[in-house]
């Protein structure tokens, strides 16, 4: 299977998992399959439709709209507010959750048939380093709870601090949109910087669905 796309990557793509019966049996009938081959017919249960799936912070709070007048909405990283590349947000700024919730409401109105909507952190690890965010990381941190990992993964997540900030951000969004869309589900990535479970969060909103990905974990130890 030859891959042809806009960005360089391996020349061959493993395709066995795009068989409809296999996809249905392994419960992989979600957005990744939808993007690739549009498989999984109604005979096999159809696709799970996820609106705005992926690393979508730039869609939740568009830098083209807000960066010039409100650089404080974006991550303070290495003493600079960054809006380029794989964007981070200042998740503790109260305006950011409100803007993201408004974006989410717009998506829900525009795509009423979606099974889930999404909050997707970036791959970059560009967590905001402002004073308020750092204080929140400390609040949610589990200093002694890092599991067995390999390589650079041992430095992830400020021991659960970022996961706590991200979940609180997602809770705020879910609470705000529930007024208009009480039954809509919102997916959220938990991986890399948000992989370690935080302390001091006892409950997440009933409409939040956790996408847990143990990337970088050794297979020799339990989750």
Name each model feature, range by range:
Residues 187-219:
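Substrate-binding cleft/loops of secretory-pathway carbohydrate-active enzymes
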């Amino acid at each position: 299977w030859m891959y042809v796309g806009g960005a360089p990557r391996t020349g061959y793509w493993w395709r066995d998992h795009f068989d409809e019966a296999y996809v249905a049996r392994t419960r992989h009938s979600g957005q990744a399959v939808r993007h690739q081959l549009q498989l999984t017919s109604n005979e096999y249960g159809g696709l799970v439709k996820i609106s705005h799936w992926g690393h979508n912070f730039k869609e939740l709070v568009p830098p083209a709209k807000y960066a010039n007048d409100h650089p404080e909405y974006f991550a303070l990283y290495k003493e600079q507010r960054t809006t380029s590349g794989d964007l981070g947000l200042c998740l503790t700024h109260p305006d950011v959750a409100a803007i993201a919730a408004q974006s989410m409401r717009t998506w829900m109105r525009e795509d009423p048939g979606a099974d889930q909507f999404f909050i997707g952190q970036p791959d970059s690890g560009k967590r905001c380093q402002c004073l308020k965010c750092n204080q929140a990381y400390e609040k949610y941190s589990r200093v002694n709870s890092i599991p067995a990992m390999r390589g650079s993964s041992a430095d992830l997540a400020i021991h659960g601090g970022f996961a706590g900030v991200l979940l609180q951000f997602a809770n705020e969004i879910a609470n705000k949109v529930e007024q208009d869309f009480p039954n809509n589900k919102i997916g959220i990535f938990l991986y890399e910087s948000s992989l370690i479970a935080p302390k001091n969060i006892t409950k997440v909103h009933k409409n939040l669905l956790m996408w847990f990905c143990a990337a970088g974990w050794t297979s020799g130890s339990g989750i």
